[in-house]
């Protein structure tokens, strides 16, 4: 068990790193919020079979109030770290080892009943479930757990960014509010259920009915345009709104759609209701680096 701290862009985020018991989604303990595809899971399952090691933590969010976990994280982080390093993106990481059995017992008891939201790693989580069923073993076998990075939903350093869409299919968007620039368009999305659009060198803001802009954009606009066609064949994704504009200007796509960052409380609410969002609904930044911590899926496995 570890505490991880990352410093980036003037922010600090602290996480707990631990083994989390794998549970089917039907148990309503681990909550997904995005749909997955078969291809990526097949690749990840092959990697697990070959290595029998979790090489990077999956990222989960939890509501820390009244759990005591954020307080444990803060106490541990008050001392000198065991490891400090700079990641490839210039982010600064620090890692503390939690070796106190009393803390282990307290945190394990809390995690046993804690509902968590998958932030990043839907494909890997479902792969880990498949691997656990494949290898079998007793209920407490290492393969029945996954390496988890757990972040309090209220952590001030938690950053989620929107992913913008560029549609390659022909499209006509009407009923929008004209805007003079990309910056003005993005500013107009804050606090609204709306999407920005760019087509034929013109920006618009498209008001949408509903609670979550991304869901309504797909339900009311993109799905109507594509019909029964696979959206993954006609959509491009980028976190850079300027890139989306360039793709349209260069003829790579016919229209760009811009979104504001999602409200994580709304995402959690939908996940608790059993509803999933379209692909690439969220982008959490920065992600935990691969290889920071390993977790053996066999007790006698040597690294």
Model feature map: region roles:
Residues 1-303:
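Surface-exposed, charge/polar-rich loops and edge strands
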């Amino acid at each position: 068990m570890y505490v991880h701290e990352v410093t980036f862009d003037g922010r600090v985020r602290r996480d707990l790193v631990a083994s989390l018991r794998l549970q089917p989604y039907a148990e309503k303990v681990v909550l997904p919020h995005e749909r997955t595809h078969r291809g990526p899971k097949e690749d990840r399952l092959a990697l697990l079979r070959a290595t029998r090691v979790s090489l990077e933590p999956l990222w989960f969010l939890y509501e820390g109030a009244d759990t005591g976990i954020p307080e444990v994280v803060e106490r541990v982080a008050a001392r000198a770290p065991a490891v400090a390093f700079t990641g490839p993106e210039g982010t600064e990481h620090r890692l503390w080892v939690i070796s106190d059995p009393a803390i282990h017992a307290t945190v394990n008891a809390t995690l046993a009943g804690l509902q968590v939201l998958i932030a990043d790693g839907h494909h890997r989580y479902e792969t880990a479930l498949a691997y656990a069923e494949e290898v079998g073993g007793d209920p407490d076998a290492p393969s029945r757990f996954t390496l988890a990075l757990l972040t309090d939903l209220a952590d001030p350093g938690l950053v989620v960014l929107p992913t913008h869409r560029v549609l390659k299919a022909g499209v006509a968007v009407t009923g929008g509010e004209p805007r003079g620039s990309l910056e003005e368009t993005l500013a107009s999305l804050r606090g609204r259920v709306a999407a920005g659009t760019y087509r034929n060198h013109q920006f618009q803001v498209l008001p949408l009915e509903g609670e979550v802009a991304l869901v309504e954009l797909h339900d009311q606009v993109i799905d109507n345009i594509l019909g029964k066609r696979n959206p993954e064949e006609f959509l491009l994704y980028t976190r850079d709104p300027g890139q989306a504009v360039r793709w349209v200007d260069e003829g790579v796509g016919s229209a760009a759609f811009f979104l504001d960052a999602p409200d994580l409380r709304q995402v959690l609410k939908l996940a608790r209701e059993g509803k999933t969002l379209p692909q690439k609904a969220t982008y959490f930044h920065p992600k935990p680096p691969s290889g920071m911590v390993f977790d053996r899926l066999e007790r006698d496995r040597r690294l």
